[in-house]
A protein has these predicted regions:
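Generic N-terminal leader/targeting and pre-domain segments
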Residues: 1-171
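Short strand-loop-strand
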Residues: 312-428, 433-441, 446-458, 465-529
Length: 532
């Protein structure tokens, strides 16, 4: 069996633990209450330990002792870079890098144990399944935390995952049962199950999922990954099989490039479990009774299961609107006030309010025949409005995939956020909503934007009623009806404005009272879009 490509060991390495006994003693002095300091100590000592020459059985025993402490600090530190806007702030990025580095040191430690298995070191062959499962699990944890941070999984991680499973197959332990007491609920696992968990999470379009949804998918896979089999021959199915190439560096696909060393995922049992639960949810059964967890509520639970069924168990459906490749520039901005400014082309002022000219403005008219627009030009700078420069990668009538390169300045973004976009060949802005986000290690920010139906216009709204007499207008946006899409006219309103059947005043060349009939959706920035 081929030797693993691992860093050189060092004769001057001097870790503070070298086996299970010394690891337990050392851990007693690690300040786990201070997770930042504990993470740094664990990282430093594991780096030193992974340079140290010792027997594979001693290395395995020490790693098994420290892994619970590692798991604890990693989960706690992840709170500092998840549920954050992108791109990451410097401090968030630093914690993220340290978290990945610690997972990688655990992975490297188990790879050194695996090398001991390959070299037939005394006492380690019986632990081959555990070693393979742990190595695959830590590759999966690195991937999972990239998904949670909406960071791109690099090709070398996919290659490491496939190679890890290939080693388990070569050793004949891919299906051998292993206990992992760090799992949340199900302790029974195997190298195959650890591999499947990482594969299916990567196939679930994680850049599109919320943190709650990602946690739920991980919860499901701990229970259901065992339902997916791996075969050397394609299973008999009506849809193209899911193909893994053990010599590749990509996620499995149904109709991807020809595989050099193919394996096939049989998802029939998984598909049956998903279909059964979707059917029972539609009949009114509660998610908790279907073992879907107390946190899973309808209708979002059913919607997510349907989404996962499509990703894992169905052939890729053709897009509703054809996409075309592009490299055209596009301008973008977020925040309703900034979008209003750029859509209207001028500073927002209270509608219908006649203002007396200042002496400076009268002087400008006398000298130049008009009022200077310099104050308006400076307005966007003063208020932090930025027209960002992005580049389109592909587009359709319904959406845009675009990228903002690391060197281009811009705001931070979150899923569901309102965005205004203006392609280079367009004179006007379109409104959209961020559907997915991903940042790569170079700092480039990728976004998928779903375009909202209708032509946008800058408008203003104010409340009605006796208690709000004299209320001022605030910025809002309107969208025209689109008959072809059965989309009625709608308003994009600031946070907190929507109430069922609420009547508001909209300024359209005069005050017009409109009734809000339905909330279409609420963005992550709390901006709502309502039918009128």
């Amino acid at each position: 069996m081929k030797t693993l490509d691992l860093p050189e060991l060092s004769a001057d390495a001097a870790p503070e633990f070298v086996d299970a006994v010394s690891a337990k003693t050392w851990l007693e002095n690690v300040p786990l209450a201070n997770v930042g300091a504990a993470q740094q100590q664990l990282l430093a000592q594991l780096q030193e330990f992974n340079r140290y020459t010792t027997k594979a059985v001693s290395r395995l025993a020490a790693l098994e002792v420290v892994r619970e402490a590692v798991q604890f600090v990693e989960i706690e530190q992840a709170r500092r870079f998840t549920n954050r806007a992108l791109p990451m702030a410097e401090q968030e990025s630093s914690v993220f890098d340290d978290t990945l580095a610690l997972w990688e040191e655990m992975h490297l430690g188990y790879l050194r144990c695996l090398q001991g298995v390959i070299d037939d070191e005394p006492g380690i062959r019986a632990e081959a399944a555990t070693v393979c499962q742990r190595a695959l699990s830590y590759t999966g944890l690195k991937m999972f935390h990239r998904h949670r941070a909406y960071r791109q999984v690099p090709a070398h991680e996919w290659r490491a995952l496939h190679e890890g499973y290939a080693r388990a197959e070569e050793l004949g332990v891919a299906e051998k049962p292993v206990k992992d007491y760090l799992n949340r609920d199900v302790n029974d696992t195997s190298p195959r199950i650890a591999y499947i968990r990482a594969l299916l999470l990567g196939m679930a379009n994680p850049n599109e999922l919320s943190q709650r949804q990602l946690t739920f998918v991980a919860f499901l896979l701990e229970r259901w990954a065992e339902k997916v089999e791996i075969a050397a021959e394609a299973p008999e199915e009506d849809v193209p099989p899911l193909i893994i190439d053990l010599q590749s560096d990509i996620c499995p696909e149904r109709e991807g490039p020809e595989a050099v060393e193919p394996r096939y995922l049989d998802v029939k049992r998984l598909a049956k479990s998903l279909r059964n639960r979707i059917g029972l949810l539609r009949k009114g059964e509660s998610p908790a009774k279907l073992a879907l967890g107390e946190d899973c509520v309808q209708p979002s639970c059913e919607q997510l299961l349907v989404f996962l069924y499509r990703q894992w168990c169905q052939a890729r459906q053709p897009r509703a609107a054809e996409r075309k490749r592009s490299a055209d520039p596009v301008q973008a901005c977020n925040d309703i006030a900034a979008i209003h400014y750029y859509v209207s082309g001028h500073v927002f002022k209270q509608p219908g309010e006649a203002k007396e000219l200042t002496s400076a403005q009268r002087d400008q008219i006398a000298a130049f025949g008009r009022v200077s627009t310099r104050d308006e030009d400076d307005y966007s700078v003063v208020h932090g409005y930025v027209l960002e420069h992005w580049q389109i990668e592909d587009e359709s009538s319904q959406g845009i995939k675009m990228v903002r390169r690391a060197g281009n300045p811009g705001k931070r973004y979150t899923h569901g956020q309102l965005i205004g976009v203006r392609p280079a060949d367009s004179k006007s802005f379109m409104l959209g909503q961020i559907r997915w986000l991903m940042q790569n290690d170079a700092g480039d920010l990728y976004a998928g934007v779903r375009l909202l139906a209708g032509l946008p216009a800058a408008t203003a709204v104010r409340p009605t009623g006796l208690n709000v007499m004299g209320a001022k207008y605030v910025q809002a946006l309107s969208l025209t009806a689109v008959q072809a899409l059965n989309a009625p006219p709608s308003l994009v309103l600031p946070s907190g404005w929507y109430k069922p059947k609420r009547v508001v005043e909209v300024y359209v060349e005069g005050d017009v009272k409109v009734r809000l009939t339905e909330m279409i959706e609420r963005g992550s920035d709390q901006i709502g879009r309502a039918h009128v």
